[in-house]
Regions:
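N-terminal glycine-rich beta->alpha transition that marks the start or flank
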Residues: 29
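Short, surface-exposed ligand- or partner-binding patches at beta-edge/loop junctions that are enriched
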Residues: 69
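Rhodanese-like catalytic fold shared by cysteine-dependent sulfurtransferases
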Residues: 2-18, 22-25, 33-64, 74-109
Length: 109
């Protein structure tokens, strides 16, 4: 993470659209399973931040673009940093679910 990451404003709505148009990308929610079931962005996968070390078992392609979000942005920042340390090369912290304006899905998927 660079100093610019701290001050850069990210529009989760634009980033979700970018994810959906980027070939092979993964939209990753690092919220708790309960938060995810209550509402999530369609097409996202859920790996709670405390289980992010297990990502290597679920996200096999370390070169695939990964767009990470959480509730407010802080867990996404932590997870994105950890994913980079695990060898994932194209990881984007797209911020917090609170700012998302699109339609939500409920339940596990």
């Amino acid at each position: 993470m660079s100093i610019l990451d701290i001050f850069k404003s990210v529009d989760i709505n634009k980033e979700v659209n970018r994810c959906r148009t980027t070939k092979g990308s993964v939209l990753l929610a690092v919220r708790t399973e309960g938060e995810y079931r209550q509402g999530h962005i369609g097409g996202s996968r859920n790996i709670p931040v405390e289980k992010i070390d297990n990502a290597v078992n679920l996200l096999h392609d370390k070169s695939a673009p990964i767009f990470v979000y959480c509730q407010s942005g802080s867990r996404a920042r932590k997870a994105a940093s950890k994913l980079r340390k695990l060898g994932y090369v194209e990881v984007y912290n797209i911020g917090g679910f609170e700012q998302y304006q699109g339609q939500l899905q409920r339940g596990k998927r």
